[in-house]
Amino acid sequence: MNPTAEQIQKINHFSKVNIDMCAKIASVVDIKECEPKEQLLTEGDTGDTMVLVFQGQVEVSKNMMVKTASGFTTSRKPIIRLETTDPRPSRDPETESTVFIVEAPAFGIGEFSLVLDNAIRTAHVNATTPLKYGILGLEDFTRIVKDHPEIGGAVYFEVAKSAVNNLATASGDISNLTQAFFFALTR
């Protein structure tokens, strides 16, 4: 079963695309379902698909190096949770959130895969509730954009905004870490 054009348009990356063009995108996306704890994306993997979440909640996490008594080890740190509002998840998450929950009617993750072949996944994404989602592949999206170039401008602009926001956040994080490192060295 395919999502509706209206479901596609709820996702911020497609919100500026007219409804007829959203129908073209919907035609190449199949709705899938999964249970909590299913991993949708793995940090460090490469991919050419974007995940479109229509109902449910996911947790985004990153690998972090942690110092232990025996040296360093990798630990997974939750960064944020994303949750749909239209409709809300079918049930509460299995685990309580320890991070901020961002709500949106629907949302997309892995959007850089609509721009780059083999885009590197920058975080882990796991379902925390039952999920209804779809997969939009780069090949299908590229074919739609070639046939309907007006879609590309609106979507690529939203992806570029996302990249700029991520870069600004990363820059601030690097600055804070650098200051903390120098502070630790002077103690």
Predicted feature residues:
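Polybasic "coupling" helices that flank or enter modular domains
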Residues: 126-128, 150-187
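Cyclic-nucleotide recognition modules
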Residues: 7-10, 75-156
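Cyclic nucleotide-binding regulatory module and flanking cytosolic helices
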Residues: 1-36
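Cytochrome P450 core scaffold surrounding the K-helix E-X-X-R motif
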Residues: 61-70
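Short, conserved beta-strand element in jelly-roll/cupin
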Residues: 51-57
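Short beta-strand segments in beta-sandwich/barrel cores
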Residues: 30, 39, 57-62, 87, ...
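Short phosphate-coordinating micro-motif centered on Lys-Gly-acidic
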Residues: 40-45
